[in-house]
From Swiss-Prot:
Family recorded in the similarity comment: Belongs to the cyclin family.
Keywords, sorted A to Z: Cell cycle, Cell division, Cyclin
Protein species of origin: Saccharomyces cerevisiae (strain ATCC 204508 / S288c) (Baker's yeast)
Protein name in the entry: G1/S-specific cyclin CLN2
PROSITE patterns on file: CYCLINS
Length: 545
């Protein structure tokens, strides 16, 4: 049996191939657009910044998510969203804007873990329908062009619901009706305010949106250069005339500038995608993040770039924090992002350069930390040894023996004061009272010894000085009488003051003679402390017999 003839295709059949968008036309459109922007430059910049600040996510509220803790879950959910944006072939900037919608939604609603993919996929769908892009430089509205031209921008690509259902669980978890319900829920939560400025408005200039046009122009320049070289080689073989090299130099300079421009556009797009993973950047405004992106580009490319919009200047501290966050994000770049950008012109050398710089910086910080630790150990080592406790030391200077009350003698040198430093107590802040359990034999009714019954130590000190002084003849008899009196009243003597009569004045050691000496009114007065002064001296005097 003869094979059946193929049935003709029904419907409109288009065999036309898209043409390249004319470069002359795109240049004229860009020039006209720049002239218009110059007239309303300040008003446009003010409005863009105001809208960005108005719709800024709140990281403090995102931190309160019970199941979607950003520290634990953000990396995984953003990686899934990026992979979804790659397989659905959405245009540049849609991924970052969908992350922005997700953060704004998390600032107002609780997101369950099993519904996280549904939320981020719906945010991607909304962002693609809002900022899907088209194949025109100036227009921002999604308008189908019919595929007549190739370039200068990628065509609009809005994911189908069937694609989202397939990539979010192959129809076993979510269906199309759930995406429609979630879309309406997100719109109601955000009050239908999903049309906000993008970070591309700050980082990418108008002419940098037409990367396809630059790549097309680069291919054309390369092809013209090859044809010109062949033509010049044929002319040089046919004739001995010298060939003018000035056209070659101009073409090489133009080609080099074109390559640098393409690398710059690729780096900007790469850093925009890297910033989407960094949760710490939510604390800053979009224009501050854009300044950080330009700072890291200028640092590693030795160029001077800035935003086209008029934006406020960022403080050095904020700019340094953003720069450090971006560098950490590049060092720990996700594998899915690396797979996409490893073949893009100029991105992989930039990543390696940042990693080398970060590694070198970590080494320097480690060396500085080790030096600081060694210095601390050297300083904490005592520079001189303390004096032995048995060494002779300077006695305490004499002070007034008068006290305001008999029970509380505030004189710092009085041994019969309740705050005496010669008695051991539990704490220098809370002094302990003297306890006398001895009975005085000649006291009335056998009462215990009172504080007033004790002989004042300062009076003993003056008697001692009189004995050893020039007029010691008259004072010797008084001193002998005092010895006899104390011998008869030995049971009522304070052991802390007995050494005045037996061995001379007390020996007090003053070790801390530095800038911060220890207080003399506490029990810790005679103890050395290396924390109070780094330099301590042990001083003594000759004991008088």
């Amino acid at each position: 049996m003869a094979s059946a003839e193929p049935r003709p295709r029904m419907g409109l059949v288009i065999n036309a191939k898209p043409d390249y968008y004319p470069i002359e036309l795109s240049n004229a459109e860009l020039l006209s657009h720049f002239e218009m922007l110059q007239e309303y430059h300040q008003e446009i910049s003010t409005n863009v910044i105001a809208q960005s600040c108005k719709f800024k996510p709140n990281p403090k509220l995102i931190d309160q998510q019970p199941e979607m803790n950003p520290v634990e879950t953000r990396s995984n959910i953003i990686t899934f969203l990026f992979e979804l944006s790659v397989v659905t072939r959405v245009t540049n900037g849609i991924f970052f804007h969908s992350v922005r919608l997700y953060d704004r939604y998390c600032s107002k609603r609780i997101v369950l873990r099993d519904q996280a993919k549904l939320v981020v996929a719906t945010c991607l769908w909304l962002a693609a329908k809002t900022w899907g892009g088209c194949n025109h430089i100036i227009n921002n509205v999604v308008i189908p062009t019919g595929g007549r031209f190739y370039g200068p921008n990628p065509r609009a690509r809005i994911p189908r619901l069937s694609e989202l259902v397939h990539y979010c669980g192959d129809g076993q978890v979510f269906d199309e009706s759930m995406f429609l319900q979630m879309e309406r829920h997100i719109l109601d939560t955000l009050n239908w305010n999903i049309y906000e400025p993008m970070i591309n408005d700050y980082v990418l200039n108008v002419d940098e949106n037409c990367l396809m046009q630059y790549e097309l122009y680069e291919n054309q320049v390369t092809y013209d250069k090859q044809c010109s070289e062949k033509r010049q080689s044929q002319l040089s073989q046919d004739s001995d005339a010298t060939v003018d090299e000035r056209p070659y130099q101009n073409e090489e300079e133009e080609e080099e500038d074109l390559k640098l421009k393409i690398k710059l556009i690729n780096l900007k797009k790469f850093l925009i995608d890297v910033s989407a993973w960094q949760y710490d950047l939510l604390r800053y405004e979009l224009f501050e993040v854009s300044h950080g992106i330009f700072s890291i580009i200028n640092q590693f490319t030795n160029q001077d770039h800035g935003p086209f919009l008029m934006t406020p200047m960022t403080s050095e501290s904020k700019n340094g924090e953003i720069l450090s966050t971006l560098m950490n994000g590049i060092v720990s770049i996700p594998n899915s992002l690396m797979e996409v950008y490893k073949t893009v012109n100029g991105v992989l050398p930039f990543i390696n350069q940042v990693k080398e710089y970060h590694l070198d910086l970590q080494r320097k910080l480690q060396i500085a930390s080790n030096l600081n630790i060694s210095r601390k150990l050297t300083i904490s080592t005592p520079s001189c040894s303390f004096e032995n406790s048995n060494s002779t030391s300077i006695p305490s200077p004499a002070s007034s023996s008068q006290s305001h009350t008999p029970m509380r003698n505030m004189s710092s040198l009085s041994d019969n004061s309740v705050f005496s430093r010669n008695m051991e107590q539990s704490s220098p802040i809370t002094p302990s009272m003297y306890q006398f359990g001895q009975q005085q034999s000649n006291s009335i009714c056998g009462s215990t010894v009172s504080v007033n019954s004790l002989v004042n130590t300062n009076n003993k000190q003056r008697i001692y000085e009189q004995i050893t002084g020039p007029n010691s003849n008259n004072a010797t008899n008084d001193y002998i009488d005092l010895l006899n009196l104390n011998e008869s009243n030995k049971e009522n003597q304070n052991p802390a003051t007995a050494h005045y009569l037996n061995g001379g004045p007390p020996k007090t050691s003053f070790i801390n003679h530095g800038m911060f000496p220890s207080p003399t009114g506490t029990i810790n007065s005679g103890k050395s402390s290396s924390a109070s002064s780094l330099i301590s001296f042990g001083m003594g005097n000759t004991q008088v017999i």
